[in-house]
Amino acid sequence: MHAASQTLSVGQKAGWGLADMGVVVFVIVKQLLVLSFLTNYLSVPVGIAGLLTTSILIFDIITDPIVGYLSDRTNSRWGRRAPWMAIGAVILSLGIIGLFGVPQSLRLYGTIIWVGSFFGLATIGFTMVAIPYGATAGEMTLDPKERSTMMGFRMAFASVGILAVSYTHLTLPTRRGV
């Protein structure tokens, strides 16, 4: 995608901003729901659950600039960002399915390894989507006013995602019932 100074349609800006709803949903899953899921549903002790989630967040801090660097240097017929986002979406989806699809037959350490592996997979998939996605605004237009409007749509949809996940988090059942 090459930046141009043409005006983007409202639909293009809104469509671009809508993607951030999915991005923010996973951020909240990563920072809120996984810890609750580990402790309230899987009965993982709080200290171990905290160590696991912190380790994955540190992993995320390391992988973000690496993916940004690699995506900046990708040359493909689909552009620099699209291959990363497409592959990342598949990896993220598989990671989320595995993260919340923990076999009940696992004991504590098996559960920790399972969740840690799939949480790490989901996190790298998320990074492969979110980092290139964030860079696309500058490639869609050179006009700072257009990019500002795009960011407005992005933040509006992010807010909707935050509200939706916040409500869902309050209604999630635990192993002991609602």
Give the role of each language-model region.
Residues 2-170, 175:
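Membrane-embedded alpha-helical bundles of multi-pass transporters/translocases
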